[in-house]
């Protein structure tokens, strides 16, 4: 275990999908910015169904903070109706080196 893992607790990974008015409102840009502020890694992208989906990885407390942001805050012009989280699990190492927007 690295010192980071010990200091911050277990590493977590979670997939998410955000429903509501989340496309055309800079949601991905703000998600990327918030992830960088919190220090989590992963990705975000728009779906054909009008939702935003992605994955977040990092220390459990920071992943939980990002989950809260994805559920309640979002971008200033967005309207979040609901956010679904799935595949939440403990991981031994991060799969990403940063947070990016996928197309």
From Swiss-Prot:
Signal peptide: none annotated. Pfam families: Acylphosphatase. Its EC number is 3.6.1.7. The modification S-glutathionyl cysteine is found at residue 26. Belongs to the acylphosphatase family. Monomer (TU1) or homodimer (TU3) in absence of reducing factors; disulfide linked. Its physiological role is not yet clear. This is Acylphosphatase-2. It comes from Meleagris gallopavo. The gene is ACYP2.
């Amino acid at each position: 275990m690295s010192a980071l893992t010990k200091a911050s607790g277990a590493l977590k990974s979670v997939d998410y999908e955000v429903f509501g008015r989340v496309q055309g409102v800079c949601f991905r840009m703000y998600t990327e910015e918030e992830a960088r502020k919190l220090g989590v890694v992963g990705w975000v992208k728009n779906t054909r169904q009008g939702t935003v989906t992605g994955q977040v990885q990092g220390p459990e407390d920071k992943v939980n903070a990002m989950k809260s942001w994805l559920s309640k805050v979002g971008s200033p012009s967005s309207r979040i109706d609901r956010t679904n989280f799935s595949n939440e699990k403990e991981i031994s190492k991060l799969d990403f080196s940063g947070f990016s927007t996928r197309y």
